[in-house]
């Protein structure tokens, strides 16, 4: 999980920052999880990796703020996907956040309207 979630976020961020610094602007949005704030017993490695993504976001935000770059993350709860519906068939899907709802939050964070938001971990929990 650390390799997949945290290392991947780190390497992609490391790859895009030089161009953003050169252009004196940029938006980085990582995908974390609500479990990154409070671990859950059944998904320990996942929680740890997502906590790392949140700390990575905060650290990068501080490091690049003077270059006109914002770095934030979104923390979805359970996402309404086909795979999750199969895995949790007894759950109330009506309360889950949909992928397009997460996308709208990400689009906002990438907009000029969000230029004052930097280093934030935005919860996207729906009604769960």
Q: Language-model segments: which ranges?
A:
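Helix-to-beta-strand junctions that scaffold the AdoMet/dcAdoMet cofactor pocket
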Residues: 20-23, 65
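Residue(s) in the substrate-gating loop at a strand-loop-helix junction
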Residues: 33
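Catalytic Tyr-X3-Lys loop
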Residues: 1-10, 25, 29, 53
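C-terminal helical subdomain
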Residues: 66, 73, 81, 91-127
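Alpha-helical segment proximal to the catalytic Tyr-Lys
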Residues: 18, 62-63, 115
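Active-site loop immediately N-terminal to the catalytic Tyr-X3-Lys motif
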Residues: 38-44, 66
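Active-site helix of classical SDR
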Residues: 13, 49
């Amino acid at each position: 999980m650390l390799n997949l979630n945290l290392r991947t976020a780190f390497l992609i961020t490391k790859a895009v920052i030089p161009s953003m610094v050169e252009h004196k602007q940029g938006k980085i949005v990582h995908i974390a999880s609500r479990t990154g704030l409070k671990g859950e017993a059944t998904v320990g490695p996942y929680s740890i990796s997502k906590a790392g993504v949140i700390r990575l976001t905060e650290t990068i935000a501080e490091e690049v703020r003077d270059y006109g770059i914002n770095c934030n993350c979104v923390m979805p709860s359970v996402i309404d996907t086909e795979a999750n519906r199969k895995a949790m068939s007894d759950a109330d899907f009506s309360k889950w956040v949909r992928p397009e709802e997460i996308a709208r939050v990400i689009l906002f964070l990438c907009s000029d309207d969000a230029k004052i938001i930097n280093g934030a971990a935005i919860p996207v929990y729906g009604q769960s």
